[in-house]
Amino acid sequence: MTAIETKRIGSITQIIGPVLDAKFPPGQMPNIYNALIVKAKNEAGEDLSVTCEVQQLLGDNQVRAVAMSATDGLMRGLEILDTGAPLSVPVGEITLGRIFNVLGEPVDGLGDVVAKTKSPIHRNSPTFIELDTKLSIFETGIKVVDLLAPYRRGGKIGLFGGAGVGKTVLIMELINNIAKAHGGVSVFGGVGERTREGNDLYMEMKESKVINEENLSSSKVALVYGQMNEPPGARMRVGLTALTMAEYFRDVNNQDVLLFIDNIFRFVQAGSEVSALLGRMPSAVGYQPTLSREMGTLQERITSTKQGSITSIQAVYVPADDLTDPAPATTFAHLDATTVLSRNLAAKGIYPAVDPLDSTSTMLQPWIVGEEHYGTAQRVKQTLQRYKELQDIIAILGLDELSEEDRLVVARARKIERFLSQPFFVAEVFTGSPGKYVSLADSIKGFTMILNGELDSLPEQAFYLVGNIEEAIAKAATLKE
């Protein structure tokens, strides 16, 4: 060890769960966000290496840092080394088809990653002059999304929903469709979700050839996991690790990248777990007082530049289905489109359970999507809204008490509701029906035909779980037989 490195060694003075304090020699203090490394041996004599990130300078030559892995086996007095730089992770094609942890170490058992380039996970967002401002739609092949709440290329999209309404399945379908239809690269950040789901996603991707086991570099996705069992430090930073990998594809390879974050709420939750240990006074509902800043720092780096774009799709767990909770409310401020998943639709068996009236998009404007698309979407929403208003009357008095006109609205609304469902490629295993990719033009055509009354004679079950309108007509013919 050189003389310079010797100077940068401190010692641990206190450990409180995932947070530890260390004392350094005068004038040798590490900077905020520097990575510190503790090397030790546990009781079994195995080597331990714990990486921490400096969060606070406490005075009296002490710093407070958050550990990225478990602090079991560490004790006071152990040496701690200042690396002199923030955490850096591998970037580039070498990351495709692999699973990394927050430190950029592969955790898939396929050997080490020898990266030509590493990037620090903390960096500034692009400057104003680097940003690209042109508006264009990102077609997903999912009817309800493309028609009613279209995604913006280089935008941020929130997937809102409680537990078990299908957020992760929708994300898997999007990765699949984007890889097949756009040939784009995706980066998936698993932030504080179930390890089983992470494993299922990986296996699913291998089966659908999104990850190519024979030739990993031709894979379409890099995975970064910091799951529920990880300490809060890892869950707080794993989103930045995934974002750093996505930024390289955008800035250096000039690609359009999809960044999935599942789940952005867990990023906030991890921040709130360490906030109190860092000595900060809690804010509303016990969240960290720095909530807006932490969210803004992450979100402002996700954007389109002159080089390429990062389109981000973020699953947002809504605690107790309360959209006014500070975590989802802070996330809302950054989004271009919201896809809200509804428990009522899931209970009816309509998948994807996207709520057509609650989901919104800033892209649904006639001068962006065109008059035909805008007009069809508005008519679909009006029909569904009228049906919603009539539901109380139907529940109390029955359908027969409605006027002829309202009965027609209800019949068409029920067809629209069913036609908004769609078989997914990634759900073929469960449903047995092959997945369908529906182009935007086909979606508009189908809904226009229903609204114009051209299909009033068909039974409503013909519209359930089909792709385009031709399939619904064919299904109606087989139902008659």
Swiss-Prot record:
Family designation: Belongs to the ATPase alpha/beta chains family.
EC numbers, comma separated: 7.1.2.2
Origin species: Mesostigma viride (Green alga)
NCBIfam families associated with the record: atpD
Keywords on record: ATP synthesis, ATP-binding, CF(1), Chloroplast, Hydrogen ion transport, Ion transport, Membrane, Nucleotide-binding, Plastid, Thylakoid, Translocase, Transport
SUPFAM superfamilies: C-terminal domain of alpha and beta subunits of F1 ATP synthase, N-terminal domain of alpha and beta subunits of F1 ATP synthase, P-loop containing nucleoside triphosphate hydrolases
Cellular location(s): Plastid, Chloroplast thylakoid membrane
One cellular-component annotation, GO: mitochondrion
BP terms from Gene Ontology: proton motive force-driven mitochondrial ATP synthesis
Membrane-topology annotation of the record: Peripheral membrane protein
Functional note: Produces ATP from ADP in the presence of a proton gradient across the membrane. The catalytic sites are hosted primarily by the beta subunits.
Chief location of this protein within or outside the cell: plastid
Catalysis performed (reactions): ATP + H2O + 4 H(+)(in) = ADP + phosphate + 5 H(+)(out)
Protein name (database record): ATP synthase subunit beta, chloroplastic
Domain of life: Eukaryota
SMART domains associated with the record: AAA (SM00382)
Molecular function via GO: ATP binding; ATP hydrolysis activity; proton-transporting ATP synthase activity, rotational mechanism
Gene field: atpB
Lineage: Eukaryota, Viridiplantae, Streptophyta, Mesostigmatophyceae, Mesostigmatales
Subunit structure comment from the entry: F-type ATPases have 2 components, CF(1) - the catalytic core - and CF(0) - the membrane proton channel. CF(1) has five subunits: alpha(3), beta(3), gamma(1), delta(1), epsilon(1). CF(0) has four main subunits: a(1), b(1), b'(1) and c(9-12).
A Pfam match: ATP-synt_ab_N
UniProt binding sites for ATP: 161-168
